[in-house]
């Protein structure tokens, strides 16, 4: 039975500062490094041995993957990066303090931007230096691929496209796959995998550093789902 394990990266420096991070390549905080180590240790204790790891293009997810693989003594396996596993793009909210945004726009609009399924925050202008087209990570990407804002639904669509294209075929082959990514990215994936409604997904939380395990049969039907915490 093939296993898929989703892990949200450990706490980042901007998580600590309560800022909207999105595609900004913020590093892990010391606490986040420890969270990643503990995730790897828990997976080792539970007997996991992965065939391949995927991460986003962002260092907080990449480093989380590396730390987990090191704890499992699996640094030799393929560790592939796919931008479609990036965090949701927060548009004009990128880099702003969440409490300050809430005070400015009001709680109702703040929750709509932050937690709703299909409402994106205000977009970045194309000449805003926070736009991904100015980021060297994406210098070879067609500009039309790069978002200036995203809803959770947008995030889910691109992440699940990567899942169906790259991950699902490996699970069908019986491979065990680790994905280290981001809170909204994983929330969107869980929504589709678990069949969570648009109304219920805003209340669903993804904790940092807690592995979420899916067990699949040969037909890619989910047979079991659980967290290792």
From Swiss-Prot:
Pfam families (alphabetical): His_Phos_1
Enzyme class: isomerase
GO biological process annotation, one example: glycolytic process
Residues holding substrate: 8-15, 21-22, 60, 87-90, 98, 114-115, 183-184
GO molecular function: phosphoglycerate mutase activity
Entry annotation: catalytic residues: 9, 87
Reactions catalysed: (2R)-2-phosphoglycerate = (2R)-3-phosphoglycerate
Domain of life according to the entry: Bacteria
Keywords associated with the record: Gluconeogenesis, Glycolysis, Isomerase
EC id: 5.4.2.11
Pathway(s) it belongs to: Carbohydrate degradation; glycolysis; pyruvate from D-glyceraldehyde 3-phosphate: step 3/5
Record-marked site positions (Transition state stabilizer): 182
SUPFAM superfamilies linked to this entry: Phosphoglycerate mutase-like
Assembly and oligomerization: Homodimer.
Function: Catalyzes the interconversion of 2-phosphoglycerate and 3-phosphoglycerate.
Protein name: 2,3-bisphosphoglycerate-dependent phosphoglycerate mutase
Source organism of this protein record: Nautilia profundicola (strain ATCC BAA-1463 / DSM 18972 / AmH)
The organism's taxonomic lineage, starting at the top: Bacteria, Pseudomonadati, Campylobacterota, Epsilonproteobacteria, Nautiliales
């Amino acid at each position: 039975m093939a296993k898929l394990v989703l892990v949200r990266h450990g706490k980042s420096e901007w998580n600590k500062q309560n800022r909207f991070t999105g595609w900004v390549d913020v590093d892990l905080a010391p606490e986040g490094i420890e969270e990643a180590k503990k995730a790897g240790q828990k997976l080792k204790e539970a007997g996991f041995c992965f065939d391949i790891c995927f991460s986003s293009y962002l260092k907080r997810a990449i480093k989380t993957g590396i730390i987990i693989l090191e704890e499992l003594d699996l640094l030799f396996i393929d560790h592939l990066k796919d931008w479609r596993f990036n965090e949701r793009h927060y548009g004009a909210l990128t880099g702003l303090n969440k409490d300050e945004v809430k005070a400015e726009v009001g709680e109702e609009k703040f929750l709509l931007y932050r937690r709703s399924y299909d409402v994106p925050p205000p977009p970045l202008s194309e000449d805003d230096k926070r736009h991904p087209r100015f980021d060297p990570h994406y210098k070879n990407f067609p500009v039309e691929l790069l978002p200036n804002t995203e809803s959770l639904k947008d995030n889910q669509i691109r992440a699940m496209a990567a899942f169906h294209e790259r991950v699902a075929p490996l699970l069908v082959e019986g491979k065990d796959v680790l994905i280290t990514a981001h809170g909204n990215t994983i929330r969107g994936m869980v929504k589709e995998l678990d069949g969570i409604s648009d109304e219920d997904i805003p209340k669903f939380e993804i904790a940092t550093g807690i592995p979420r395990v899916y067990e699949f049969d040969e037909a890619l039907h989910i047979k079991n789902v659980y967290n290792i915490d």
